[in-house]
Amino acid sequence: MIKSSVGGNEGKSKFFDQEKRLERTWNNSNWGKQGIISPVDGDMKIIDIELEKKMTKLEHENKLMKNALYELSRMENNDYAAWVIKVLFGEVAHGAK
């Protein structure tokens, strides 16, 4: 984990570690660009690896954005960040009214 002596950077190292973990998931793949045959709804279907990678990356970026908004709303007591969380995710931010 990256440590920083400057205040306020603690959250950045946590997000960086999550991105490295995502990269390792796909770099260890034995399948390359081939599809994987997998049961989906009882039928055998070919799953496109490239599409799965893109979808996983989008889901991961969404999760990082959501975590960053939660941290911003919590640490800065930012009403705008709390409003964005409520509109996008339908949830109330931690500590928000």
UniProtKB/Swiss-Prot annotation:
Gene Ontology cellular component list: host cell membrane; membrane
Coiled coil: 49-78
Membrane among keywords: yes
GO biological process, one term: viral DNA genome replication
Its membrane topology: Peripheral membrane protein
GO MF annotation list: RNA binding
Keywords noted in UniProt: Coiled coil, DNA replication, Early protein, Host membrane, Membrane, RNA-binding, Viral DNA replication
Cell location: Host membrane
Function of the molecule: Protein that assembles into highly ordered structures and provides a specific site for viral DNA replication. Probably anchors the viral DNA replisome to the host membrane.
Subunit note: Homomultimer. Self-associates into large complexes forming long filamentous structures. Interacts (via N-terminus) with the primer terminal protein.
Similarity comment text for this entry: Belongs to the phi29likevirus DNA replication protein 1 family.
Comment text on domains: The hydrophobic C-terminus is involved in the association with the host membrane. The coiled coil region is involved assembly into protofilament sheet structures.
Protein's name in the database: DNA replication protein 1
Gene behind the chain: 1C
